[in-house]
Every structure is written in structure tokens, then in C-alpha cells.
A protein has these predicted regions:
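Catalytic cores and adjacent flexible loops of soluble metabolic enzymes
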Residues: 1-351
């Protein structure tokens, strides 16, 4: 296992997640969620139309223009970097220039393998504009791992600063991804990242494997929302990397769980909380105790996510009244009511 010391997640709820609302995120939705992601400690945030720059004009209109997405989000943030996706033949060079002029920090150039040569002018301009420039090879598994690495080398020679393995079909097993990573690292001298989809339930596992094999970034979305079966889950990946690997300590994972429950579950119209199930899994606490723990948290006005985690730290088999009281006493001074009230007050996805 070799971990990149500069590893960060790249949060793409506001771009890939835009698919699930038919590109309906407004610029207000985008800037508000970006604001609370930054507040949670996320440093890299991708925004905009699911198909990237220019797609509103050429494919299907989004709820906001590319310019408004960038301008409104940039004006809201103080430290986090924002980026957008761009597919040559959908996006134009002028689209990238306009976005850069408005303060875009990074650009992710998406191409199918057979269109690699289209990258040259886009990479050249993006680098000239001082954008952090990534190449995302969509449908990476359409060629074998050796051929993939050869095309990645071409993108590096054009000036790309990072190569993304993109499991567009969500079909890769961990052993497949490991081979792509191995062959890629023998060919290029720049970092790599991974963007997974969850069609066969491998997005989280593959993202962790990429992390363990020196990826600079893996892409995540809150609750895994995204095109098709979705992506790796921000709250799950952050919590696992914090608890099992001691990484991403600057991110407030508990706050992200609340974002997932209070905002994204509402957006999805979920009747049963997926976030709570994730929290129980992360804490190794059986969901047979869920009702009991929820009721205890309400009666004692304690954060349910913190309570579940504290219970898991004490006992992953039993959950009687004594265990819950002991867990409660261990966290009762960890007050986060102000930040959660702030989250409740921030209106988006609902006007």
C-alpha cells in the first residue's frame, strides 16, 4: 500500500449529481451547497451541467448558465477550489476562457479514448489560463490497461497535469482497477485519479483501492448521487479514510452526514434514511438497534450520528440502556447544535 501524501477527495455532487434532477440545480442551489461543503472542509468542488461546459447550449439546458454557476459559486467561497467538466466538441475553447475569466480553478477534460487527439488544443489553452488541468478518459475500460496507459502518456505529453481512470459503466472489479493503475503508473510521471460508478456496487471499494495505490484524488458525491447507479459516497469515503487510515482529518465527517440527511435525502424524497444506515455500518453497530438509538438521541437531545459512533467504540455486539448512557456521557460535551441549526436555516433544493 502506498498512499499519496497530498490525497484529497474531489466532490462532484454539484456536477455528476446534477443528472438526477435533470440538470435542475440552480446557481443558488449550487453556491449554497458549495458553501456548506467548504464549511465541512472540502477543498475541491466540481460544479455545473452534468455534461460540462457548453452542454446547455448544445445538448440540454440546465437551470443556470455556465457563467452563473461559476460566478455565483466563486463569490460564495473563500478557500475551496471550483472546477467544471469539459468535453471537446461539446465545450469550446471560448467556453473555457470565459469560465477561467470568472475565476474557475480547475478543468477536467473528458474524452473517449478514440478522441484523445482532441485534447491537444484544450490542454494547451487550459494550461495557458493557469487552470489545473486534468484528463478524464471516459469509458476507460473500453481498451485494455496497456493501451489505456499509452493514451494517458499522450495526454501527459500534451501537458495534462493528471490522468483520471473513469469507470463510466461501473463495471470494474477491484482486480481490474488495480491492473489499470499498475500499467498507468509505469507509463506516466504525473498523478492519477479515479472516478467510479456504482452499477455493480464497486464504487466505494474501488475508490478505496485507488487511494491505497497512490491516487491523488477520487471522486465522490453525497449519498453517492449521480448518473445511472451513482458514484462513491462522500460521507462513506471520508469516514472510512478518517477512521481506518487516519486521513482527511480536516473534514467534518459528522457535518457531511447531516448534509446528506437534511438536504440530499430531502431532494431524493427518501422515506427511510439511507444516511442512518451508512452511519450504523461505519460504526459497526447492527441496525436492529436503530429505533432504540434514535429514540434515545431524541429524548436526550444528542446528535444521533455521534451517538452511534460512540456506541460502536464501546460495544459492537450489544446496545442496552447502560451502553447508550455510557456513550452519551462520552460525547455530551461535543455540541454541534449551532452548525446544524445553520444547516437547517440554509434553504436550497426547495426554493
Amino acid at each position: 500500500m502506498k498512499i499519496n501524501a497530498n490525497f484529497e477527495i474531489l466532490e462532484t455532487t454539484l456536477r455528476d449529481g446534477n443528472y438526477i434532477v435533470d440538470f435542475g440545480f440552480t446557481s443558488k442551489d449550487t453556491s449554497n451547497l458549495a458553501f456548506i461543503l467548504e464549511k465541512a472542509g472540502i477543498n475541491m468542488i466540481e460544479i455545473g451541467h452534468g455534461l460540462g461546459l457548453g452542454a446547455s447550449k448544445k445538448i440540454k439546458p440546465a437551470a443556470a448558465s455556465d457563467e452563473d454557476y461559476v460566478k455565483d459559486t466563486k463569490n460564495t467561497l473563500t478557500t475551496a477550489k471550483i472546477g467544471m467538466f469539459a468535453i471537446p466538441n461539446i465545450a469550446s475553447l471560448e467556453d473555457i476562457k470565459k469560465a477561467a475569466d470568472l475565476g474557475l480553478d480547475f478543468i477536467r477534460l473528458g474524452v473517449d479514448i478514440e478522441n484523445t487527439m482532441l485534447l491537444k488544443d484544450f490542454i494547451k489553452l487550459s494550461r495557458k489560463l493557469n487552470l489545473i488541468t486534468y484528463t478524464n478518459f471516459m469509458k476507460s475500460s473500453s481498451v485494455n490497461s496497456i493501451k489505456f496507459a499509452e493514451y494517458a502518456k499522450i495526454a501527459e505529453d500534451f501537458g495534462s497535469q493528471m490522468i483520471y481512470i473513469v469507470d463510466s459503466a461501473g463495471s470494474m472489479l477491484p482486480r481490474d482497477l488495480k491492473q489499470y493503475i499498475y500499467d498507468l503508473k509505469t507509463k506516466i510521471n504525473i498523478p492519477f485519479g479515479f472516478h467510479g460508478h456504482d452499477n455493480i456496487g464497486m464504487a466505494n471499494a474501488n475508490s478505496i483501492l485507488a487511494f491505497e495505490n497512490e491516487a491523488l484524488h477520487v471522486d465522490t458525491t453525497i449519498l453517492g448521487i449521480g448518473r445511472g447507479s451513482g458514484n462513491a459516497s462522500t460521507e462513506t469515503i471520508v469516514s472510512i479514510l478518517q477512521d481506518k487510515y487516519g486521513k482527511l482529518r480536516s473534514i467534518n465527517s459528522n457535518y457531511i452526514l447531516h448534509i446528506a440527511q437534511k438536504k440530499i435525502e430531502k431532494l431524493l424524497g427518501l422515506q427511510t434514511s439511507k444516511t442512518l444506515s451508512e452511519a450504523f455500518g461505519l460504526a459497526s453497530v447492527h441496525t436492529m438497534y436503530m429505533s432504540k438509538i434514535i429514540n434515545f438521541s431524541k429524548d436526550n437531545k444528542v446528535d444521533v450520528f455521534k451517538l452511534v459512533k460512540a456506541i460502536g467504540n464501546l460495544d459492537t455486539v450489544n446496545c442496552d440502556e447502560g451502553i447508550m448512557i455510557k456513550a452519551f456521557n462520552s460525547i455530551k460535551d461535543q455540541n454541534n447544535s449551532d452548525e446544524i441549526q445553520h444547516l437547517d436555516a440554509l434553504k436550497f433544493f426547495d426554493g
